[in-house]
Amino acid sequence: LPGGQLKSELGFNTSLNLEAQTLAVSDLVLKALGLQLEGQLNGTAVLGDAAFDGEIRIGEFNPREVIQALGQPVPEVSDPEVLSRAEAALQLAATKDSVSLSNIQLKLDDSTVKGELKVANFAKPAIRFGLHLDQIDVDRYLPPQSEQPPVPHTTAAAAGAQMIPVETLRALDVDGELTIDQLKAAQLRSS
């Protein structure tokens, strides 16, 4: 953070019942870095094996402004109009061992991702997901043509071995599906 400080505002209403071991946080509003997060959270068995559920919404914001507020350079992209609009909404459920995000709706510029994501057993995570992307033009997010470094000539196998940590990937427990309605990359379209 530039200057090592973050200016923020936080507001919420809360109700804690120790006898029933319940927690309710409503009207949650957090403002920082040009973002406004809103939501609510409910908890049960808060003094034991706590479980929480709730929803989170981040209203429309400008990602470029957030990146700059964090003191980071905005990535150089081919289309100066991208990274200008984003918003998010989701429902969550969590325990000490798992988290589940459902009704995910993430928007970035003209693209929307919807779906769900679950992580069970944090000690050895099992990740499950189902995500749907309506459309994306990857070319718009790439560096301008003149700034792309030249690609060295290597075999496909050698290039793949350098880029993908295969042994690390083999140890992962990930199962999911990503569907894309319309994809444009390298000036090619797929639907």
Regions found by a protein language model. Give the residues of each.
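Membrane-proximal interfacial segments on either side of biological membranes
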Residues: 1-7, 11-28, 33-100, 109-191
